[in-house]
Amino acid sequence: MATQGDFRARFAAALNEAKGKADTLEVQLGGEVLGKILKTDVKTQAEIKSAVNGAAFEADIKSFLNEIGIPGDDNIETGFQLLRQSTKPEQMLGYLNSRTLLPKDLSGNDPISLTQDLLALPANVAKKLFIWSWKSTPSTGRGEVWLSLMLKDGKRPDSTQKGDMMIDKAEWEVKGDGARIAGQKGFGDAKQMRHHLNTAIVKFCGDIGRKAPDFLDGSAADNAWNIGKKSAGLLGKSLEALAKEKKFTKKDLDKLNTYLVEAYSKYLLNFTTKLSLTKGVVGLDGKINIAKYNRILLEMYYTHYENTEEFKGIFLVSYTNANKVLACTTTKEFLSAVDSGKIKIAAYPSFTDAAGAQGGSFAIQLV
């Protein structure tokens, strides 16, 4: 005969079972119950929904990634695993199949927020998509894949194309934080610039009937000819020493510019310019306005880079302190962004023994 304790135990078990049913959700696949999860387990529910959505749209997502030139099954799988986490897959695929985002639309907009709005991706996944890259030769930098995926007519370049990404068959360059204004061609050996600048001063002195300073004996430190944010290096030291003996004339400074441009053309291969590194920059007393000198030199470098690479435009991508993207389609737009403080010089040209071809150029990044 059942005791009072037996009834109490059965009643408690029945209550627990009822409570369990109320607190859980069944997970079914094709009518088969695979198990249960707690109603409060929002994370697992989201993962299951993502898996179901991903499975339903896997072919479409992977087909899109293949069409825009994502190389290799591993990379396509990585892209799929990111995109499958969209909370609105129909909206995401609708956008990817009819992309509308233009380069000009990126200025002032947070790329993570744009990705969330257009693809309905969680913020953490949108960030992963923004910085998604892989090892390759030449390297695939952060932001390049995101731009190829999000922009109207965006694609990855094929083996016959030299841009970092393509928009409607036009080549675009992408520069991340601290990237150098230099490409794969058109630049000489930065280490030799010490010799070229030294030679420029010697030739200049000979042209104006002056004796070159005694300290130009080749024994200086390898960074002596570097011109940074505050120091004009041996160039500034040489000019001030010469002007101390006898001030320059405007004609002298015009000749100096000729020799300086000639020196830089040894690094910026086949470079010609009408810009002057001395007019309004170097005083008759030999003092260099370093800010003006670097601003003109930056314009020379960028113009050479643009003409050599023949790209449609350049994207600057920032992902360290803040997520930003800026598009520039002309030298004027780039320099305007520099002058307005949107772009800053992250590093100045270095001509040391450790400098490679790109080390002799300016490094830039968004502010």
Predicted regions and their residues:
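Short, positively charged
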Residues: 24, 28-162, 170, 174-367
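Short linear clamp-binding motif
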Residues: 3-15
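Intrinsic-disorder/low-complexity linker and hinge segments
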Residues: 17-19
